[in-house]
């Protein structure tokens, strides 16, 4: 039986208009069988997306051959059949949304197959219900959040009934509930016989697959089951990747709990393997650790009773924010979380004047954003914003020029090169290697780094980040969060939104949770994450380490509530074991 997809010594080069080449794939040979569930992982720029676009002939190999169900992708007459066989959900959903109404976009593919209207209607309805977008079916896609756009794109592919779906970072922009739904859909589709190929930076997602392919510099570095790949931590780390969070926690706890064996890759399997606590006594129960309020902290951002309606007075009117109030202190790190469509991006865009208050007040340092004579340029010099999708703010041809654009507008001349170098180093881009790279040859993660560097190069006092680590590989994510903490320590005020609770646990000191445009829960990171049932009601969940600690508390372990770091969990367990309490 033929493999569903077969690559034989495939190479691929990107070629710029001026003749420059960039080798993205090198001599790759792989076979993908019908019904497999494969995760493809690798550092930013390793060639994952380039590889994926060969699976349905969006890219054609520079050398070697790609066969899909026995059809050569270089034969253009084969392309319709190939693209009916292999569907793809892109990293950025805007790349594949073509219609002005959600249900019309989902219908686009089936219509091009020449199906009967009744069959098209059934496929569209089934796909929209599958991704929980039935209520949004008549809305324009441009009014949806990024996470909702991802689900529109997925629905469009599902409506084609392909034999294989390639998910290219499909969950990167989704909230925990939406992400869980997509992963469950992937599992269900796989159980029903569909071939699933998942490109991801989330190691816990990769652990769900039957097979993992690890890429590095356009080549296959590792290929095996998740257990085989994750058992070689040293090689994995050297490739810019990491173990799943649960596996890292298990490794840290193993010196104290040797019964925790290898291969614990998921939160659920780890909690099941942890022994119950013995000899529990009330005297060992800890109180909730609260973060003390700093009465001397200086408020830098004040939002009171803010409301915003898109397309007010039209049939498409949509209330994005209602009565939102937050305060961000100078030199602090403030996180905004919530499900997709909860108003996070809308709130952030009020903090540098991209949107102005319709109701309520927003004050940024000395600036009242409702003031008729507001110096908006001064506000934007003070406040930098990195958008959720970096392509929306990249427009120069070369990386160096992109990052230098802002400082040039501010009149920086004498130290421009050094300022650009500093910004690139802060996000982990080597100056000499990247300054002359063409922006269109960059991976999604590399573009995100360039977008961040282009804002940092202007030396703002406040940095707003909309999903700052989305699309970054584990090493780049870890490095970025560390550098943001260092910048905060040097006096930068951070305000950021994210669906990744692990990032919030590392970086945020205080959080506010938005639900349907309202601030429903605000407090220190530990306080918010300790309220797991409330978070579940809001469509969120605490980070893995908090969930593991909560599971241990249910087993009788007298641990602090609201633990947000792996080091703290391991320290507390070590103290209990060392004291002979268990």
Q: Which residues make up each language-model segment?
A:
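Helix-to-loop junction immediately C-terminal to a conserved catalytic motif
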Residues: 56, 352
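Conserved ABC ATPase "signature" C-loop
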Residues: 218, 516-517
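Conserved ABC ATPase signature
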Residues: 140-144, 148, 438-442
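ABC ATPase NBD Q-loop/coupling interface
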Residues: 65-81, 361-378
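The feature captures the beta-strand-to-loop junction immediately N-terminal to the Walker
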Residues: 41-43, 337-339
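Conserved ABC ATPase "signature" region
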Residues: 118-136, 415-433
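Catalytic Walker B motif of ABC-type/P-loop ATPase nucleotide-binding domains
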Residues: 165-168, 463-466
């Amino acid at each position: 039986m033929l493999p569903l997809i077969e690559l034989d010594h495939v190479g691929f080069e990107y070629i710029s208009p001026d003749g420059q080449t960039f080798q993205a794939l090198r001599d790759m040979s792989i076979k993908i069988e019908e019904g497999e569930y494969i995760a493809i992982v690798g550092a930013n720029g390793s060639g994952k997306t380039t590889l994926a676009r060969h699976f349905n002939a969006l890219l054609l190999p520079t050398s070697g051959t790609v066969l899909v169900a026995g059809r050569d992708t270089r034969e253009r007459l084969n392309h319709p059949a190939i693209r009916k066989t292999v569907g793809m959900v892109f990293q950025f959903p805007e790349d594949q949304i073509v219609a002005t109404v959600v249900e019309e976009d989902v219908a686009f593919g089936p219509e091009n197959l020449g199906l009967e209207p009744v069959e098209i209607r059934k496929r569209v309805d089934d796909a929209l219900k599958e991704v929980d977008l039935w209520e949004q079916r008549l809305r324009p896609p441009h009014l949806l959040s990024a996470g909702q756009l991802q689900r529109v794109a997925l629905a469009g592919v599902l409506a084609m009934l392909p034999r294989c779906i390639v998910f290219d970072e499909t969950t990167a922009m989704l909230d925990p509930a939406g992400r869980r739904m997509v992963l469950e859909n992937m599992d269900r589709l796989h159980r029903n016989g569909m071939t699933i190929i998942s490109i991801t930076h989330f190691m816990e997602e990769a652990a769900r697959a039957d097979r993992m392919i690890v890429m590095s510099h356009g080549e296959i570095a590792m290929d095996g089951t998740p257990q085989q790949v994750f058992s070689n931590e040293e090689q994995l780390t050297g490739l810019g990747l990491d173990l799943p969070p649960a596996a890292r926690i298990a490794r840290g706890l193993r010196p104290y709990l040797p019964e925790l064996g290898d291969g614990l890759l998921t939160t659920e399997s780890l909690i099941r393997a942890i022994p119950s606590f013995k000899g529990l006594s009330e005297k060992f129960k800890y109180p909730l650790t609260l973060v003390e309020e700093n009465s001397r902290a200086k408020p830098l951002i004040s939002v009171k009773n803010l409301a915003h309606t898109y397309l007010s007075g039209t049939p498409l009117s949509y209330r994005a924010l209602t009565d939102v109030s937050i305060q961000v202190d100078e030199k602090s790190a403030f996180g905004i979380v919530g499900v997709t469509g909860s108003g996070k991006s809308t709130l952030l865009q009020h903090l540098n004047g991209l949107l102005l208050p319709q109701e309520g007040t927003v004050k940024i340092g000395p600036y009242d954003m409702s003031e008729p004579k507001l110096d908006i340029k001064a506000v934007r010099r003070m406040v930098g914003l990195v958008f959720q999708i970096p392509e929306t703010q990249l427009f120069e041809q070369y990386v160096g020029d992109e990052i230098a654009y802002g400082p040039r507008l501010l009149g920086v001349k004498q130290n421009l090169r050094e300022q650009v170098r500093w910004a690139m180093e802060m996000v982990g881009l080597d100056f000499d290697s990247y300054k002359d790279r063409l922006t269109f040859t960059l991976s999604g993660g590399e573009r995100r780094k360039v977008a961040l560097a282009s804002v940092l190069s202007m030396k703002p006092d406040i940095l707003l980040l909309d999903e700052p680590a989305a699309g970054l590989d584990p090493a780049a994510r870890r490095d970025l969060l560390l550098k943001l903490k260092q910048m905060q320590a040097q006096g930068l005020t951070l305000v950021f939104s994210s669906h990744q609770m692990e990032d919030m646990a590392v970086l945020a000191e205080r959080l506010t949770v938005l639900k349907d445009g309202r601030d429903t829960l605000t407090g220190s990171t530990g306080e918010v994450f300790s309220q797991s049932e409330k978070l579940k009601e809001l469509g969120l969940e605490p980070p893995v380490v908090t969930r593991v600690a909560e599971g241990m508390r249910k087993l009788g372990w007298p641990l602090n509530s609201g633990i947000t770091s792996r080091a703290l969990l391991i320290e507390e367990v070590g103290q209990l074991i060392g004291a002979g309490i268990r």
